[in-house]
Amino acid sequence: MAYFVYVLRSVPSGRFYIGMTGDLERRLQEHNSRNGRWSSRWKPWELLGYEVWSSRGEALARERHLKGRSGMQERRQWIKSLLERQAAG
């Protein structure tokens, strides 16, 4: 089974969210439909990009790294490259 580390962008606010899941479509739908959760405040969300990992453990470690202090520079660079790719068409 494949696991995904993904980046979402809030359409109205421009905020970013990084997460991990085994079902990317279902997870995006949850972010856009749930009420009362942190991510529901800034919906709708759009998928900017994702990475595919072969194990849940690898994906979880990657998500934690990107969300942590040690991954801040890498996180910013990844988001920047995704935004540039989106702007290029």
Language-model segments: residues:
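Structure-specific nucleic-acid interaction/processing domains
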Residues: M1-G89
